Amino acid sequence: MALRDIFKFRELPESETSKPFLEHLEDLRWTIVKMAITLIVAMIICFAFRGTLVRVMQAPLHEIDQNLGVLRALGITDSIVVSFHLAFYAGIVISFPLLLFFIAEFILPALTVMEKKVLFPAIGVSFALFLTGVLVCYFWLLPKTILFFFHDTQSLGWAPAWTVQEYYSFVTRFTLGFGLAFELPVVVLVLVRFGLITYEFMARTRPYAIVLIFILATIITPTPDVLTLIAMSLPMVVLYESCIWIAWFMKRRQSRAT
């Protein structure tokens, strides 16, 4: 594949002229620069409120055991390192709409007039899905997961004494990962739009996808509670089904257009 074909997805099929490869690279560079600046500004804001962030992130611990709320800082620089770590992930959350906009702006040349009109509503829906995933994880799944590990540790005769580094690394990645999982419909929408997957493929692989979802839910939610496992898997199954309908709708619209 020639270098000029790498950015072929940014051009409309009916376009007769191709944009030079270096211009595509320049657009990509500016997209990365804008995303980096946005994330850095968001990190600075979050770092300024690190005390509030710490109290929010440790709230699930206090609900289980007041003593667990006192985490151990084993490193001299833990206060700064963990604060930057927390500010980075919190910065992703608050800057997510702008990051999505810059990504959409990069692929904008390949969008039709109708798709450009629904760009901002689509970004709003995407952020709403992401935020829903984060909140569901924080208020429901995260406390249950921490409680499970707390009791499992005690069942072995050990006293839970978690460190700052371990706790925040687990909580931030777990919460952010769940939020990104809720972006599945948006990812599918983009893949279908550029012809990388089809409605037929998704419908054909539905049984395998559902089994995979339950396996992932079992790994993510290490609890013997069947109801928790079902409650964890059900939203993902619904999201996958919605992706199939999205792919079907897009195929039908494309066939009508032709």
Model features per residue range: what roles?
Residues 1-258:
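Membrane topogenic/interface segments and analogous intrinsically disordered interaction regions
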